[in-house]
Amino acid sequence: TGYTGDLGYEIWLDAAHALEVWDALVAGGSAYGITPAGMLALDLARLEAGLMLIDVDYVSARKALVDSQKSSPYELGLAWTVDLRKEYFVGRRAHAEEAKRDAQWQFVGLEVDWNSLETLYADVGLAPQLPSAAWRASTPVYSATEQVGYATSGGWSPLLKKYIALAHLQGSSAAVGTQLEIEVTVEHRRKRAAACVVKKPFFDPERKRA
């Protein structure tokens, strides 16, 4: 299905055969380490894959209450979904105008610096406290003293052994390699940890193209 960012399939069948097919899949996959996964695990997998989630990482234009809540395909890295060669479609004129200029915002990947995080916790006598699941909250991102964007999803990747996040950043701060800071809460106090803009997806296995 692609939601995990890895090779996957959807199986559609009559409900009466669901248990039989499930048992067959589990039995056939046991030699390959097949394991059922719940939504918390899937949410981490989609984070590692750099996949955005509606109403978490972006707001639908149908639900946006103010213009600042809206995002265009160009700002979300989805310019490839807009075909301006088509003669007419709703919104074509606006898309054509936006395509002529650089997007004001970019949806990017962030990697939080482990040493920076470790230092913040060491200052209060603790080891880094890592989230057990992906978090979903608007979290400020800074360049020096200026807020230049906000992260929307993040968490510790057990696969990559890295603290990663997805974020909306102003175009001038969105280039891969840009050094920034992300807000973290350490013992109920707001701190800033160093973070770097990195290429999405975080995890991109060759096997998913099979």
How would you name each of these model-derived features?
Residues T1-A210:
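Conserved, structured C-terminal
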